[in-house]
Amino acid sequence: MAADAPEAMAELTYPLGTEDDLRETAKLVGALGRRCLPLTLDVRDSAAVGAAIKQTVTDMGSLDIVVANAGIVSTGELVDVSDVVWQQLVDTNLTGAFHTLRAAIPVMRQQRFGRIVVTSSMGGRMGIPELAAYNATKWGVIGLAKSAALEVAKDGITINVICPTTVQTPMVQPTGSDDIPDDLVRRMMRANPIPQPWLQPEDVSRAVLYLVTDPGVITGSVLEIGLGGSARMH
């Protein structure tokens, strides 16, 4: 997503938890002739999120676009979800988005401009077996974003949500392997009306770019990127 952003914007702050990804992304962005401020950040830490926002404004001069994209997933039946796993999901997926919006909105209000995109999931739009805990956080993210969008609608700020289905990233690969099992590919293809097993990262990037380059008439909306899954929803 960060590598696609320079096509539409000049400067970028990229907070992520892994040093290797930070270096690689900064290199890709730099090759396009754009500035990138790479930061390590744990969105569960409210003070760290606030400091990252402050550093962005100091180094870049403004905070025009924020994408709250941090997230984790855990699968299993609800009765098998431990308190620890539940709290990890809530702290990262929901509280992390809350920390991000709460820190970004005052800066954008002062500017009278801002574009915020929050990543939910198709799991935030429907029930899915063995994803109850994860889906609860993603439903919550939508409620958070929609309510906040109403609070800032008169301030030149838009807040929208994207709901991608599964994206081909390391998150869907078995630990310690670069290969994705054939049976998983077949199962995912059967699940989607459009016969693809999953999205590519750039599919999600294009949706984000559409929302952040909007002139200001779209807010509180949910954009589903579901390979046809939206057609099955009531």
PLM regions and their residue ranges:
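Alpha-helical segment proximal to the catalytic Tyr-Lys
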Residues: 106, 150-151
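Substrate-binding pocket helix/loop in short-chain dehydrogenase/reductase
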Residues: 77-78, 85-90
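Short C-terminal tail/terminal secondary-structure segment
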Residues: 126, 208-209, 216-234
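Short, small/polar-rich loop/turn modules that mediate ligand/substrate recognition or access, typified
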Residues: 153, 158, 218-221
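Short-chain dehydrogenase/reductase
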Residues: 1-60, 74
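Active-site helix of classical SDR
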Residues: 101, 137, 145
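Residue(s) in the substrate-gating loop at a strand-loop-helix junction
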Residues: 121
